[in-house]
Amino acid sequence: FQIGYFKNYVTGGNNSTTQYRMTNPAAEANFDVIRANASWSEQVMPGWRLTAQLDAQHTDYSLIPGEQFGAGGVYSVRGFEERVISADRGTRQSLELMGPNVSKNFGTLFERLQFVGFVDAAQLKFNNPVFGSPVEPHLMSYGVGARFAFSPKHQFRVDLAKVVSGVPIQPHGDVMLHVTFATSL
């Protein structure tokens, strides 16, 4: 669990209310934000792991886009483009069940192969919504995926997600495949 308090002080130049209002007419340079995240992971059966995650942001201010809580993407709400939506405050939840390592069923091809099922969601809120925009947009998806490695240095992640609740550019029923690769030297 982590929680942090962030305060922005007006220092002039580009860090001024005048500059901030060029992107958001209700924004002020003198704002504060509370951000928190928590995660829990538990082995529920031999080889099976359940993981829950929560991220949150709270403020009473109308923020510029770079300070807003963003949702959508491979490490947020799968099934959506990266940061498909952002707002002044919000929460993101994820629940993922990872199965046992089944790599031995494929000979020596994989060092590790585990399948996952997941549900992701986010709720956001604008403190001063712009005319025509949703006051409290929300995203939700579910899906399946795999975590595999050919060696300890090369890790792959593949997730296929279906949108349950979306935004106009990615509505209910939309499907997206996320693929990531990580390597270490």
Which role does the model predict for each range below?
Residues T91, E111-F115, H138-V144, F150-F156, ...:
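A short pocket-lining beta-strand/turn micro-motif at the edge of beta-sheets
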Residues F150-L185:
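Predominantly the C-terminal beta-signal and adjacent terminal strand-loop region
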